[in-house]
Amino acid sequence: MAQADRPARGGLAARPMRGASFALAGLVACAACAAVVLWLRPAAPSPAPAGAVAGGPAAGVPAAASGAAEAAMPLPAALPGALAGSHAPRLPLAAGGRLARTRAVREFFDYCLTAQGELTPAALDALVRREIAAQLDGSPAQAEALGVWRRYRAYFDALAQLPGDGAVLGDKLDPAAMQLALDQRAALADRTLGEWAEPFFGDEQRRQRHDLERIRIANDTTLSPEQKAARLAALDAQLTPDERAQQAALHAQQDAVTKIADLQKAGATPDQMRAQIAQTLGPEAAARAAQMQQDDEAWQTRYQAYAAERDRIAAQGLAPQDRDARIAQLRQQTFTAPGEAIRAASLDRGAGG
């Protein structure tokens, strides 16, 4: 999973054409995320501090006390907005109804973590308990899944104590810094997740070490281009067939993203960019781009209406505290979906509002 999106910035000059470019650029950015060395950041969004419930045995809270706290917590009535219309991945079972130690368990938890921006830590724990119970109620795997969730939360709580939440700081691909970040996160996963560290992060860590070695080879000034190519080929030969296929798909996506970015820099129209997206990333991606464009144009229209009312309030000569409170109330009433009010506030700051 990924980190929380940064709010968009800009001024009141935002118009539908800018919205079209914003939407298309957003799709390009989403594709580009896959082309980055993903392990420069922690692998999933970091939950808020979990408190007694999330700490669990892995964080030093007795299991009995943790279970009592969980039982007392009310369950959320409905899925939060980020998960509306979706279903949690299936939790895998092994023989005897026990929880299978596979990455699918992490994918289940990462699905729930998608909603963390809308929920308090207690509500997030309640959501996870409800989703676990929906699949495993009364089985031995239910208690196991709750225990693994507590460990996973403890992992993120500890990760938040590292500089930059365990991310590589700075803009350069510094192999030493990357190695340190990888080692720190691996040690932390072993300490908090125990036997679950391998199914949760094992494949990812091996890919990360492979990526790191590629960077080291590319940065080695003592090697000729031919020597670098030979070493990279030898390194890639160590990959499994599935890993090689994934790498080839990633390279193809990188090429597509580069072409689309070049079009954007050259001032291509939204229609031209959508055509390129359809050609390089497929018709489904082009359809998503069109929908993103429509959604963003609708948002820009709402923002412009809001900005006019905001400016009217600002012109009334109110005391700064009263003016800001009125504008904040207007913003919250106008932008109700998660993240919208933050984006509007950022645009206000860019416009000097």
UniProtKB/Swiss-Prot annotation:
Phenotype seen when the gene is deleted: Significant loss of extracellular active lipase (lip). Not required for growth on oleic acid as a carbon source. Cells can translate lipase; while its signal peptide is processed, it is not secreted.
Any one GO cellular component localisation term in the record: plasma membrane
Gene Ontology terms describing biological process: lipid catabolic process; protein folding
Any one GO molecular function term: unfolded protein binding
Pfam family, one: Lipase_chap
Record's note on what induces expression: By growth on olive oil or oleic acid; part of the lip-lifO (also called lipA-lipB) operon.
Parts of the chain that traverse the membrane: 20-40
Compartments where found: Cell inner membrane
Membrane topology label: Single-pass membrane protein
Superkingdom per UniProt: Bacteria
Residue numbers on the Periplasmic membrane side: 41-353
Keyword entries, A-Z: Cell inner membrane, Cell membrane, Chaperone, Lipid degradation, Lipid metabolism, Membrane, Transmembrane, Transmembrane helix
Topology Cytoplasmic: residue spans: 1-19
Physiological role: Involved in the folding of the extracellular lipase (lip) during its passage through the periplasm.
Similarity-based family: Belongs to the lipase chaperone family.
Known partners and oligomeric status: Monomer. Interacts with lipase (lip).
Protein name: Lipase-specific foldase
UniProt source species: Burkholderia plantarii
UniProt gene name: lifO
